[in-house]
Amino acid sequence: MSTNLHWQSFGQGPDLVLLHGWGMNGAVWQQTVESLQADFCVHVVDLPGYGFSAEHHGEDLAQIAAMVLKDAPEKAVWLGWSLGGLVATHIALNAPQRVSKLITVASSPKFAAEKPWRGIQPNVLSAFTSQLLEDFSLTIERFMALQAMGSPSARKDVKQLKQAVLSRPQPNPESLLVGLNILADVDLRDALISLTMPMLRLYGRLDGLVPIKVATDLSQQLPHTQQFVFSQSSHAPFMTEHDEFCAQVRDFAQD
């Protein structure tokens, strides 16, 4: 069995790595790749346990990050969506020489709510965990619906996410469980202060998983970082407001 994760590279220019979220795979970036490959060499990986990397498995955030770094470009702009944002942030904190700039999309240094911090209610995460053990494809479908909820194009977004997921092998249930545990337990809030590279945080105003209050709180904690809020988007702004999303990434990653 190969120990290498599934990577694809498109276009030419500065290196840009895209990391997908929980339950998904690299196919979610297809439209983004098509728009950005004229300006960047875009690298897309299926995280351990997902898509064409389904036979691989990382036990925790540190191991997942190490597996991703193994075949990643020497130095790149890293963009992580949702759970992928935690992976990208972990890499930026622990291997800063590999990360020229960091972009997080609909992501949070701590996904679980814990007053006064806003986030996903722990009971929602534990419900997903118990559902996962019974029927993981239904659980992923529910998670997709939750991600798109609130967006004016919710139905279209869910359809697009679903097509992407179904176009590659099903995720490995063990890795799905690890991912939910990461979302429930990881807290990088205090660590963020030590980030050295430029950072852009992108949010959807209507996001039910990463409440917009997270953006405000982090702006105060990280005044040297940039942020942008997509007014019509929920958890997947790269689909809902695709052109504006690509413009934000382009402007930040190129300057």
Curated annotation (Swiss-Prot):
Q: Which reaction does it catalyse?
A: 6-carboxyhexanoyl-[ACP] methyl ester + H2O = 6-carboxyhexanoyl-[ACP] + methanol + H(+)
Q: Which InterPro entries match?
A: AB_hydrolase_1, AB_hydrolase_fold, AB_hydrolase_sf, BioH
Where, per UniProt, does this protein localize?
Cytoplasm
Q: What class of enzyme is it?
A: hydrolase
Q: In which pathway does it act?
A: Cofactor biosynthesis; biotin biosynthesis
Keywords (alphabetical) are:
Biotin biosynthesis, Cytoplasm, Hydrolase, Serine esterase
Q: What's the family? A: Belongs to the AB hydrolase superfamily. Carboxylesterase BioH family.
Supply the name of the protein. Pimeloyl-[acyl-carrier protein] methyl ester esterase
Q: Which organism is it from?
A: Vibrio parahaemolyticus serotype O3:K6 (strain RIMD 2210633)
Q: Which gene encodes it?
A: bioH
